[in-house]
Amino acid sequence: MNRMVSHRSVWIFFALTLLLSWAIWIPTQLLVPENKQLPLQLLGGFGPFLAAIIVIGVKEGKSALRQWLRQTFHLRLNLIWYLAAGIFLPFGIALLHHLLYLLAGGKSAFTFDQTWGIYLAELVSTALVGGGNEEPGWRGFATPRLVAKFHPIVASCIVGIFWVIWHIPLYFGSWVGKDQPLLWFFIYASGLSIILTWLYFRSSQSVMPVMLLHAGTNIVFDFFPRTNVIFSSADLDFNVFKAIAYWIVALIIMVATKGKLGCRDAYPDSTSDSYGGA
């Protein structure tokens, strides 16, 4: 891969992602009643994936696009990666979040009143249309191209920043903004971006486990309480603890991988220059 072309393509990807998704989301927030917005909000969520397809198809050709699709969606992974992504990591992070809540003086109100069948059905549907479908763009396209230029942690944070910016129109609708302060979303999304980058490289650059983890983190917190123990707002408490939990896990990964987030396995011939000298 030509590094200069790759580096330029990723900025085109970010711009196109915003254009495609916002072209749906902004008119939706302005013109569509709240109770009818969800289908269009979900449709806009395919912006990163579609932008990646367009950029690769136009700048690298159909052959490169087919190769990228095969690599991005390959399934031949050890079962442990699917279990870790869909169950162990989401529930581990959520339980850490709950522990922090208890240490701060909250009362345990953890419930899991759904069957595992319902959880798994929600996990798959959310991976396909409710958040996980973003990952072919964010992690499958943008992350490896940024890592060709920047340190893996820097690359993860760049993706995290655009990830948050991309969500901004949803803060004016019924889906995100009412229970998720933008500042704390930025903080925990940056930590989650590092975790997702690590999982992407450790799973041989397949986005399938990454889609499951993204989906799992979207739904698992539905089983945990929102009671204020520090701030006046239960939602603020919830998101503060959520951000801390994500960053604890992200820091553990950063220390364990010496900041490489597993990408040295994917680019064994890379040098420090590949990361912009970091």
Question: Where are the regions a protein language model picked out?
Answer:
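Membrane-helix interface linkers and caps
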Residues: 2-4, 24, 28-85, 99-115, ...
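Membrane-interface starts of transmembrane alpha-helices
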Residues: 8-9, 36-47, 150-159, 206, ...
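Alpha-helical transmembrane segments
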Residues: 10-22, 45-49, 82-93, 158-160, ...
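Aromatic-anchored segments of alpha-helical transmembrane domains
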Residues: 18-26, 90-95, 161-170, 215-224
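C-terminal membrane module of polytopic membrane proteins
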Residues: 57, 205-208, 213-278
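Juxtamembrane helix-entry segments on the extracytoplasmic side of multipass membrane proteins
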Residues: 109-124, 174-187
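Membrane-interface helix/loop boundary segments of multi-pass membrane proteins
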Residues: 133-160, 174, 201-206
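Hydrophobic alpha-helical segments embedded in the membrane of multi-pass proteins
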Residues: 186-195
